Curated annotation (Swiss-Prot):
RTL6 is one of at least 11 genes called Mar or Mart related to long terminal repeat retrotransposons. They do not correspond to functional retrotransposons, but rather to neofunctionalized retrotransposons genes. It comes from the Eukaryota. The gene is RTL6. The lineage of its organism: Eukaryota, Metazoa, Chordata, Craniata, Vertebrata. The keyword Coiled coil applies. Residues 82-106, 214-239 are annotated as: Disordered. The keyword Cell inner membrane does not apply. Signal peptide: none annotated. Belongs to the LDOC1 family. Residues 82-94 have a biased composition (Polar residues). Keywords: Coiled coil. This is Retrotransposon Gag-like protein 6. Residues 228-239 have a biased composition (Low complexity). InterPro entries: DUF4939.
Length: 239
């Protein structure tokens, strides 16, 4: 009786089975690596979007803080008394004098001095509207526009020390938007004052020399603009 020869036919299939499993494992690992790489890229994109959203939220919160600050003085635009406050004889009661609002300041250094002068005048005549430092800062910020308004937003954050410090806010505003021409004029004034002071001191020295009879007064270069002043005698230097 002839036995069926199945062992030789099954051996190639058994040998191919481990190779197929190995290929499946390799394919699975490759797929996992690709998936992991894609997830990492997606996570990086999400982190970038989160950072952008955080920045946008901070900007919105800063603008909201600015709007809330402006809303703290609801009567700032009402300068003259309302009609209901007119008395029966048609006259208005004694109140603070009507004062026009300061012109908005957008960051032009040449207009800063005039803007601050208008602010001082308004706050003097409308002092009852500004009981504290925060109200003063809030009103000043409400008159800023453009670049100056953007500059003020960080200083209106809850943790900013300038939010409740009017003089400090003014100092920082002046430091940021000071006029170069105004600074040059002040430097020239200081230089001229120093020169005038030197002339007065030399004139006093001349009078002392004349009273002591030690000789003529030395010429100061500023008096004729032609030659430098000669050296003073030893006795004059000791006076």
């Amino acid at each position: 009786m002839v036995q069926p020869q199945t062992s030789k036919a099954e051996s190639p299939a058994l040998a191919a089975s481990p190779n197929a499993q190995m290929d499946d494992v390799i394919d699975t690992l490759t797929s996992l690596r690709l998936t992991n790489s894609a997830l990492r890229r997606e996570a990086s994109t999400l982190r970038a979007e989160k950072a952008n959203l955080t920045n946008m939220l901070e900007s919105v919160m800063a603008e909201l803080t600015l709007l809330r600050t402006r809303a703290r003085i609801p009567g700032a635009l009402q300068i003259t008394p309302p009609i209901s406050s007119i008395t029966s004889n048609g006259t208005r009661p004694m109140t603070t004098p009507p004062t026009s609002l300061p012109e908005p300041f957008s960051g032009d250094p040449g207009r800063l001095a005039g803007f601050l002068m208008q602010m001082d005048r308004f706050m003097i005549f409308q002092a009852s509207r500004f009981p504290g430092e925060a109200e003063r800062v809030a009103f000043l910020v409400s008159r800023l526009t453009g670049e100056a308004e953007k500059w003020a937003i960080p200083h209106m954050q809850p943790d900013s020390p300038l939010r409740n410090n009017y003089q400090g806010f003014l100092a920082e505003l002046r430091r940021t938007y000071k006029s170069p021409l105004r600074h040059a004029r002040r430097a020239q004034i200081r230089k001229t004052s120093a020169s005038n002071r030197a002339v007065r001191e030399r004139q006093m020295l001349c009078r002392q020399l004349a009273s002591a009879g030690t000789g003529p007064c030395p010429v100061h270069p500023a008096s004729n603009g032609t030659s430098p002043a000669p050296a003073l005698p030893a006795r004059a230097r000791n006076l």
